[in-house]
Amino acid sequence: GWESLDEATLTIRLKWLGIFFRPVTPGRFMVRLRLPNGVISAEQLAVLAEVVDRCGEHGSADITTRQNLQLRGLLLEDMAPLMAQLERVGLTSRQSGHDNPRNITGNPLAGIDPEEIIDTRPLVDAIQAALLGPAGPRNLPRKFNVAVGGAPDSFLLHNDLAFLPAHHNGELGFTVMVGGFFSAQRNELAIPLGLWLPADQLSGFTLAVLRHFERAGNRQQRNKSRLMYLIDQLGLEGYRQAVLDSWTELVAELAAQQESHHAGDPATAAPHDGSHLVSRAPRDGLGVQPQKQAGLHWVGLHVPMGRLDAAAMAELARLVRTHGSGELRLTEAQNALIVNVPAARIQALQAEPLLQRFRPDPSPLQAEAVSCTGNAYCSFALIPTKGTAQMVLEELEQRVELPHAVRMHWTGCPNACGQPYMGQIGLMGAKARKDGQMVEAAKIFLGGAMDAGPKLAELHDKGVPLSDLADVLEQLLVERFGARRRDPAAGPSPSVAVS
């Protein structure tokens, strides 16, 4: 049983396989997948629904802020058959946790977006193949986030390495951004590296960046081991040259091993001023939207707080097969998109019972709400984020009307997995004193922007008791976001429970 495992295996080694021990639920493990670009097939989703269903009341899944899925409630003895099951349907959980490159994100509308600049799917797939291949990193100093932008609303500056579409001498490629991250100690948006790359060079360059980080990153101070600290140490010009040197070494090494298909060509990199084609905040992607393919639509569904149960996963798989092309897309806002829906199928899809729970037309408060898992599963979290967020949002819906969506990010602790600094309103689990007692509370951050003038949210209130949070947020929504207080005689708004 799991009790026989030594501490290092239980809390570190298993994470290389994507298996996570959760002290809050001893004996029940979490498995994090890798879903490059957030793409999952109906067949894969149906298999995952069966896995979660076998966990009974302990089973659930979460859509993450990296367009990924986490499965909860598994037993250790489930793991070997699960890994075989994942492999059979083309999925993996390898290197999805601890000091490894995490799921690679891209445009969730890749290939179907009327506003698409470039299809990110093959680029993201190539990067994942390189990172998980024989030349990929195995022991980074710290976790590492990579993302590829493909549309005018691809906000990616919270990643360690981000590729934003850009032109150079009339050719479409990518400008390189580096160093973005959130943590308990420091929060930074990525900065221009001063390089432009052709689209077919991203995987080789990413390998070179990670090879250098693996060799040169800080291993003595874990709280100063993210990429931006290395950039600070070397200076931007010094870091850029070190990465180019690493790339040249990688090309020679892989050529000797006859693995050069992942290496790329450093000579293709060009100096660049960091300008790019991303110009506005991300769309929510919800509702019925026309694809660039005539006669086809995607239907964006709001999944409250990204929480799924086995029945919902199985039903989603059925809807994707019945009404779409058998493919689902996951978004960083923890929502789901059914793609390639013919116009003739839209009415039937809209009539499906699941769409009363996962609505294509959520309220402006629900549409862009994001939450980490909270203390139901995470021992770092100070509050139950998902349940609290849903309860507070439903209360606010009864009190105010909003003219537009307000992006609200909830996180349980300063590690900031819920990305509170990206929210127009960010909330972070805390403690506060009320009536002489220490109680669960939330810090409030305001002002996060993900448009052409990106900005991290700043601290507004260092601790509001959860019991007072709806009152405080109501006032903020009225004063700063144009909300109008509802007539108390108005009927209730629809609500969805989140466990």
What is each stretch, according to the model?
Residues 93-98, 212-221, 249-266, 358-366, ...:
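Flexible helix-coil linker/hinge segments at domain or subdomain boundaries
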